[in-house]
């Protein structure tokens, strides 16, 4: 019988007969063979025992290897069994046995009877304490093929068995620890692997279970760094998943799920596993969370990142691990357990041994020297010169490289053409109470960081929600795309306080010490001016997008200016250059607390960023002056006088003007050619009169060399005749009807003014292609916006201005100019008020014949009127229009009144002069006068023989196309590349749009206020949409100032998508005809 290994039928019959006999000293070996679930050591020992029967060993010898014994219940049915835990000895390996009762155990010791079940501990994956709905104190053993659990009576008994089993399992494993955890693919799981927890789960065919055919009963084995799925009773390879690949996990009732990233062996997806009950599912969830949080202790692992949009997250940094002097394994080629998203890039030798580095967002516990990518895909690294820039006393926080070191990378959201990888990996990990998160994102190769949609902003937090990063280590100069360039690294070895004072700097010397490092550091701002060199002109770039349609934008980029580039044409991108005396002042010893003060300062060493561009030609002449603040310490947002205006709009900078820079370099939005436009007292009085100058299309350029190409703002008033106060006009200069007065300005003689002042277009051309429009920046309206805007275009062809500058429409329309207080009188109409001073001595008789005698070549002197609810009252008495405040009509009447002839009225008048219009009246009165001409002004040549062509009024249907705010007069041949600056962001609450045009008849009328009636009924929403005027005469004067050609000699006017007016005569030069795209 000793040599028989496989039992036959005869053997089975013999065994059956032997069972009927009383117990013998030699147990039946075949019966023992049948009871065992697998080949164990007891089988091997029983076979030779049949040859040489021996008496049973004494009880003391048999119980020497017993470590623990006692009654426990089986989990499934609750049957009580007697369990014996044996340690490794000469009798066999460590094992767990159980008998029906203690009596059989003792009898078996004497008679050699075998236990009912033997579980070798070296085959067990792990032992764990469990609890379910029925049993609160379970001790579970897991092997590859089965799960065996025992229920203890109380927690102390549970802990005793658990500790004993754990010790024996660890002793039996030896050196078989974590040998397979380095695998990231499918493989076999060797028996004896130590796991923290093992669960028997039923993987459902859902998500990855269906895609990867993973459904069925599995062992879910959790170790300290990985999780394994072992198919029960199958030879299918195990699935190994690193904990770092798990994005999140959770449970729902009796289901536990895991979501893994795309770097896992199974790919991205979810695994849904069914367990016994919700208690087990909750325990699994909590155990996974605790294990993943404890993963921080392993230095070779770092937090994973979330695969989400990079533009939705702010920047932060992880500051847990630090490499001082040595690079991480990802930089030296020893990348064994680094994550898949780590990018290995070449690092120059100069950047390998330094104590200053960039903190990367793609590292969690580890780090690397992350370079910043430029537009061309080049990499800029740290330099060892940065080491010497830090302060040694341990208070400095920011360290910057000198500007001539070439580390200012221009970054923008443009594709990288010749770089191997177009993405830069970032790592983020987070966790909450119900799930862990660890995903992956790839950041576009853009270093623009302030949250623009196209830029690669990202977030990085500590592993599993430990702590977010700290933004204070990353100071961004502005949110322009080209502002990142050189981000200050972290000074690792300095002892810094974790808490900073949030109060304002009280010492004038309290500049950041990194200003001492780069003596001429300049802060970046939005580019508000253009370079003088026409070849190097570029469009302004905002943080939102880049103008990809412009070749100049794609070819030229503004770089951080070094001291060698002070005469460059790109200097206008910098504001508040800390130069000369400011740089000298910053060399003083100062204490740096690392925070930027949030309160304004009265000296130029405050950390506020002035918003004024500086002179391109002589940057050294500009010194930053103290900021204008009030008694409460708030920054005054008024424009300054003198030099900024002159420098911005092209004037020569004088010494007196530079010394008057009193507002810290804020942009003066007022008229740009007069030095004495605004007095300092206007700032003290909180004058709001200067708020009327807002951003207008940059295409309104000057015709003469005196105008500056830097100016991107165009005042709509007369360039040489700034609206002023004087006894001759008697009009208070105010915009909001308040007491804020603008100081008087000098008015030069008309002859010298036309030659010296900047010539601006008097007509706003519509629909010019290629035009750039800068949106309005501010709106200082007195009250809230009414229900519908009055969209004014107020053009005054006058040689003498008689009213103050008027702000843009208070209703928020960038296409309107005029008084914000008077707009509210009639919020339902969209006016275009053209006030023309006729300056031809022979105009009186000519105006009687035809309205077409009006020359389209008007004077370039433009002033903003203050419209009111009444028309301008002409002193000649022939074209006086009475008030219409007390009546509202849906129609307007245009009356053609001559200066020396009785008025021709389309509507009757009452005794007191009040208009009596009827709905049948379609045109409003057009008052035409005459003034003496001055230096090529508005000319009215000889009358024409043909009959008068009155104004043609086109009336639109109420359901038809409403008039656009930019569809106004387009008097076609004023030079300059005008653009349709009134085509965007206009609110049109009413289409009752009337074009009200009149000509003054006496030069004394400039002493009176020019007002216009804007009364319109709300009953008719289909107002005047177009008005066509034929305004050419027989002889066009070629010497008219408005007839100059473009700088390139061309008079071609580009046409937009709106209607322009064709002013032609058979015997006159033909202006550009109206076309409609």
Curated annotation (Swiss-Prot):
A motif (YXXM motif 6) lies at residues 634-637. A motif (YXXM motif 4) lies at residues 595-598. A motif (YXXM motif 3) lies at residues 499-502. A motif (YXXM motif 9) lies at residues 891-894. Pfam families: IRS (PF02174), PH (PF00169). A motif (YXXM motif 7) lies at residues 666-669. Gene3D superfamilies: Pleckstrin-homology domain (PH domain)/Phosphotyrosine-binding domain (PTB). Residues 1-66, 342-373, 428-464, 476-495, 530-571 are annotated as: Disordered. Keywords: Phosphoprotein, Repeat, Transducer. Potentiates insulin signaling. PANTHER family: INSULIN RECEPTOR SUBSTRATE, INSULIN RECEPTOR SUBSTRATE 4. This is Insulin receptor substrate 2-B. The lineage of its organism: Eukaryota, Metazoa, Chordata, Craniata, Vertebrata.
